[in-house]
Regions:
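Glycine-rich phosphate-binding loop used to anchor ATP phosphates in small-molecule kinases
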Residues: 33-85
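Short, well-ordered secondary-structure micro-motifs
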Residues: 21-22, 64-65, 94-97
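Conserved nucleotide-binding/hydrolysis micro-motifs of P-loop NTPases
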Residues: 15-16, 59-60, 87-92
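Conserved phosphate-donor/acceptor-positioning beta-strand/loop module used by diverse small-molecule
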Residues: 75-98, 135
Length: 162
């Protein structure tokens, strides 16, 4: 089996799907529920020492307050936040996007949606207020990306130790 970090993965779309099952997307109650779910998971994972990967598409600068709040929440209970920006060639991104696995788990899988979001927001910039690792994963397997992240941030992982 490919090496893994052993970290739990909390995909952004999971909180969205949960809230959307009850509230219309974009409404105030929807936003409040998404927010409560995310921050409850962040805080409890950090408090309990559960290593967590949270995935989302960062829109600069609109999402900076969210990132700062995540960091404050996690660090406030003794956790650590390691920001990672994954990038790849636009052609490769567009080729990967329609993969059935992405749609199956609720991730963005539409080229039209990507183009709309990229036209409306800056989704290719790093978070300006925090250190972050940028990894070009154009030619890398997920396990290789994980190893780079673990080594860069000196994260505990038996499978990646020197």
């Amino acid at each position: 089996p490919p090496p893994t970090t052993g970290f739990k993965v909390f995909h952004n779309h999971v909180s969205i799907a949960c809230a959307e099952s009850v509230f219309d997307f974009g409404t105030k109650p929807f936003g409040r529920v998404v927010d409560k779910i995310r921050f409850a998971v962040f805080e409890e994972a950090a408090r309990e020492g559960v290593s967590l990967v949270f995935t989302f598409v960062y829109a600069c600068p609109e999402d900076t307050p969210f990132v700062e709040r995540v960091c404050e929440t996690v660090e406030g209970v003794g956790g650590r936040v390691c920001l990672v920006r994954l990038v790849c060639d636009r052609e490769v991104l567009e080729r990967r996007l329609p993969h059935p696995e992405r749609a199956r788990v609720g991730k963005m899988a539409s080229l039209d949606m990507l183009r709309e979001v990229a036209g409306r927001y800056d989704i290719f910039s790093p978070v300006p207020t925090r250190e972050s690792l940028s990894v070009d994963n154009t030619a890398l397997a997920p396990a290789e990306v994980a190893e780079l992240i673990v080594r860069h941030y000196h994260l505990p992982s038996a499978e990646f130790k020197d």
